[in-house]
């Protein structure tokens, strides 16, 4: 279980958060085909393309400039993914960003926002570790931030670990045996989100 995080106070600014989201967009652009390939094991093979639609919409909005603070920025991100990405990924990432936006109405603490983001994921039903979802990345990353030990290598480790888990959520359940040995596409895109966070300097050991 995620513990209370007030001991860790990584405070975001609008500038670093913009950089974080911009780097996330770049990673989705570069890795669209790879994410699609991962998604082919489930069926449609369009996770990368879907995520990129939301990312491009957000990129255009960021280019127009933003009047407001962190809450406004993440609300804008949430609406881009809900309105443009489509499918389960759009709803999940949309709720992640909207819940983070709500957290930023109270303070700019990174851990508070990530805790709220996890609650956004859980909006669609309780999800535990080792169920082959982005939670398998999100929760251990939060633990590493709390303990000041997060690295790019660890993020990749958490993404890769989903190969060994049996799918227990969504339509992946119906082809769970076929997915053995395959990385979860949602976990992979979540990995890019946290890689972008590190590269943006949001989290500082």
Residue ranges of model-derived segments:
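N-terminal loops that bind phosphate or other acidic moieties
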Residues: 2-205
């Amino acid at each position: 279980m995620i513990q209370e995080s007030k001991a860790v106070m990584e405070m975001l600014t609008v500038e670093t958060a913009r950089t974080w989201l911009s780097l996330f967009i770049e990673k989705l652009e570069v890795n669209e085909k790879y994410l699609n390939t991962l998604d082919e094991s489930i069926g449609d093979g369009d996770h990368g393309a879907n995520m990129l639609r939301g990312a491009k919409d957000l990129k255009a909005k960021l280019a127009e400039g933003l009047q407001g603070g962190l809450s406004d920025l993440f609300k804008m991100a949430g609406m881009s993914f809900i309105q443009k990405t489509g499918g389960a990924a759009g709803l999940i990432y949309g709720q992640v960003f909207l819940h983070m936006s709500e957290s930023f109405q109270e303070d700019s603490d990174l851990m508070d926002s990530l805790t709220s983001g996890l609650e956004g994921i859980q909006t669609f039903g309780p999800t535990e570790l080792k169920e082959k979802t982005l939670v398998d990345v999100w929760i251990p990353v939060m633990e590493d931030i709390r303990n000041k030990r997060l690295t790019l290598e660890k993020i990749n480790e958490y993404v890769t670990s989903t190969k060994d888990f049996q799918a227990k959520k969504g339509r992946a359940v119906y082809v769970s045996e076929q997915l053995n040995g395959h990385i979860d596409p949602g976990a992979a895109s979540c990995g890019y989100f946290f890689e972008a966070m590190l590269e943006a300097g949001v989290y500082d050991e």
